[in-house]
Amino acid sequence: VLFIGGGFSALLTSARLREKGVESIRIVERGADVGGTWYWNRYPGVACDVVAYDYLPLLDEMNYVPTRHYAQGPEIFAHCQAIAEKYDLYDLAVFQTTVTSTVWDGETQRWNITTDRGDTMRAKFVICANGTLAKPRLARIDGMETYLGHSFHTSRWDYGFTGADLENLSDVRVGIIGTGASAVQIIPNLAKTAKSVHVFQRTPSSIDIRDDWETSDEWAAKQGDGWQARRRAKIVSKLREQAERRGQLRGGITRDEKIRRQENNNIDAMMRIHKRIDDTVEDPATAESLKPWYMLMCKRPCFHNEYLPAFNRPNVHLIDTHGKGVTEIGERGPIFDGVEYEVDLLIYATGFEVQQTGIYNRIVGDNDLDLNDKYDSGIRTMLGIHTAGFPNMFIMGGYQASFQFNLTDLLQVQGDHIANCIKHARTHDYDTIDVTSESEDWWVHEVIAHRGKTTRNQECTPGYYNFEGQENRRQDGNYNGGFPAYIDHIADIEADMDTHFVYTKD
């Protein structure tokens, strides 16, 4: 089994494969270690924004309890390394290596993999574990190549320039483009150390309270064996109850009434966030600019206690571009509304290329079919995992898979399913396993039926939740039938494998 990528997807699926007796597992990873996004993102203040007891995978198996309610980046990265050690994943791993092509050989019924280092590898099963936050998105801004100061992307933080504790920034004027999840964690640290910080905002993020604390020894000791599995079971059970209540309400209210209730709930949440801004930010104009004006889930909600107070510091300046974004950069810094803001360091907090099919590089399946060509008119999968014509290949991430705020929950059920598929093939001595075109068609229709052309997507500010505003890409999104329903679909498929898959066997 060969994994393209060495983040959470590869680590937790490898653990399940080891449990099922798979010995030959190779990870090919661009970075110099496992961890994926937690290897690359080392910026000051980096931490998970989902409760760590749910977010970190394999806590039961690792007999580990996170030290904080929201674990910080170094702890998460160390946890990734510990998983790789426990399951002997370093032995065959290849680091600082990028897969350049993955091509199916119909005669040998194996995948031929090449890399940027000139390697040629062969694998029976390939798992695309590239991750949804794998490729930095550097905004295309006119003149950015003319900038004479220092610059970098948040996921490639240059501590050689800033110093380990940002001590080198005491006489440095810093500009940061973007106010998404990474910027929200970074800006408070810059505010404490830099001579000045200019924050260039396209769209304000919604900032809610972050209830963070250290894990007490007493609480950790009381959890017992299997505590994380029990937590996840309770979460899924709660989601089922919520779905059932929505279903009951749906039968008793009109569509207009349903929309009205959703809008009222959204207004209540946003009013609370707006009030927190007014209560925290001293300058009325700055406070007004920091208020999100869209529906709550248009953009990923953020949780932080120091972001808003940072704008009360005299060295922090908000440049509100009113949705336009920075469109020009000069030799001295970003230019907006005719003003060039002179900065010594320019940080791009512009996120990642999410839901982009080209992230897979070159993958060629049966009958010389290129995956990008197949996806050219829209993604086609079953469960977001299998795609017809690409036998023994599995995809992990978000394309046509269930939407789940805690991505690790999704990766866990996908990893379990992939391990079960591989075990099924090995048990029956199948050479290949591939999804049927009929099952793929069924799932594409499921995705479209549950996604719909929603008012929310039309009204949302551009972002990765709505493909930067490209509403015509409906089938490229998530399955919005609910996470419990997604789990049930997987269970139904595994109970009737022969209906959904075709096999070959010598």
Cite the ranges covered by each PLM segment:
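Central helical "cap/lid" subdomain
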Residues: 138-151, 332-384
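A conserved short coil-to-beta-strand element within the FAD-binding core of flavoproteins
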Residues: 95-110, 316-333
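Short hydrophobic core segments
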Residues: 120-133, 175-177, 334, 342-353
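Feature captures the FAD/FMN-dependent oxidoreductase FAD-binding
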Residues: 67-133
